[in-house]
Swiss-Prot record:
It holds the Pfam family Fip1. One of its GO terms (biological process) is pericentric heterochromatin formation. It comes from Schizosaccharomyces pombe (strain 972 / ATCC 24843). This is Pre-mRNA polyadenylation factor fip1. Residues 39-50 have a biased composition (Acidic residues). Residues 243-258, 302-317 have a biased composition (Low complexity). It is found in: Nucleus. The lineage of its organism: Eukaryota, Fungi, Dikarya, Ascomycota, Taphrinomycotina.
Length: 344
């Protein structure tokens, strides 16, 4: 490689990478060089001496040693804190019976004003009614949201309740109940509360059972029955069913016989006929039946007999005429369904 090539390489390196490390160090050395003026000032500062005057007979110690002794000194021991003992006094339990008790407030007591019950005071008796004056605050005279009218209604209600439901009246009503009392006298309110808490009071009668037999309830019959036996009935040749019934005259407390009950049944109505005869028997009535005062009246049947003959194509229990359905058969509305089709 020739010198020209080496020079070109050096120039390229300088162009690409800048100055070398040696050249930089030389530049730093040159830049750090001190001027003679600065060197003279530093020498002047180092020539300053500190002189400390001491008294005769004392030895001056260097400043460095004194600083070291001050820095090395430490407290030898921590200061002791004096602890004061607290004496605990034990109090002996006092007898509660002898101790003074604060006065109790009876919340059920009725307040009084000038010795008069507050519920008995009439507001109209006050000549000067300050709560009616304009600008007056009604809460200064009536508490709990009351006003003049609601307070009067409340007083009337409280007076009525206290008069009707007083303990004295209740205990007096208990004394009138038949039966032996537990102690022979009217029980005190405390005894009465104890008895009510334990169950039904033993001196009160037990009520009769609900839904029990009527003989136990004091009844001698189950339902009213007829006093007379004036039943004029006729029998048909086909069915042999009773076709008439008489009007009841009076009611007594005797139990009816089975024959009377059968004759009074709805099946023995004069309008119902047997399936064999298909004829109606005209009932005969007793026009001389009387009610209490002996006045004779005529009895009219509530439902006249039918003059139309019945067909035997359907049961006698149904009077609805059969209607043909789309299968050209007859259907009846019976127990078999609403529209029963007799297809077969």
């Amino acid at each position: 490689m020739s010198n020209a090539d080496q020079h070109m390489d050096v120039d390229e390196d300088e162009y690409l990478y800048g100055e070398t490390i040696e050249e930089r160090n030389d530049g730093v050395t040159v830049s750090n060089a001190k001027s003679p003026e600065q060197a003279s000032e530093e020498s002047d500062d180092s020539d300053i001496e500190f002189i400390i005057e001491t008294k005769p007979g004392e030895r001056a110690e260097p400043l460095g040693g004194s600083i070291a002794t001050l820095g090395s000194t430490r407290p030898s021991a921590k200061p002791q804190v004096e602890k004061t003992a607290v004496e605990v006094k034990t109090t002996e339990p006092q007898d509660l019976s002898t101790a003074e008790t604060a006065p109790k407030v009876d919340i059920d007591a009725v307040p009084t004003i000038d010795g008069k019950n507050i519920f008995e005071i009439d507001l109209e008796s006050f000549d000067d009614k300050p709560w009616r004056k304009p600008g007056a605050d009604i809460s200064d005279y009536f508490n709990y949201g009351f006003d003049e009218f609601t307070w009067a209604a409340y007083c009337a209600k409280q007076t009525t309740l206290r008069d009707d439901f007083s303990p004295q009246k209740f205990m007096a009503s208990l004394a009138q109940i038949p039966g032996p009392l537990p102690s022979g006298n009217v029980p005190s309110p405390a005894e009465f509360q104890a008895m009510m808490a334990s169950g039904f009071p033993p001196f009160m009668p037990i009520p009769p059972p609900i839904g029990g037999p009527q003989e136990d309830m004091g009844y001698s019959r189950n339902f009213p029955v007829h006093a007379s036996s004036n039943y004029n009935t006729t029998h048909t040749s086909g069915g042999g069913v009773h076709s008439g019934a008489a009007t009841p005259n009076a009611y007594v407390n005797n139990n009816p016989s089975s024959s009377r009950r059968e004759s009074e049944s709805p099946a023995n109505s004069p309008n119902i006929t047997s399936s064999a005869g298909m004829t109606h028997a005209q009932p005969t009535h007793n026009p001389t039946s009387s009610y209490g005062n002996g006045a004779s009246t005529n009895y009219n049947a509530s439902r006249p007999p039918s003059n139309h003959p019945h067909s035997s194509n359907y049961p006698s229990s149904s009077r609805r005429k059969p209607s043909p359905d789309r299968y050209s058969n007859y259907s009846s509305r019976g127990s078999g369904g609403r529209y029963r089709r007799n297809r077969y």
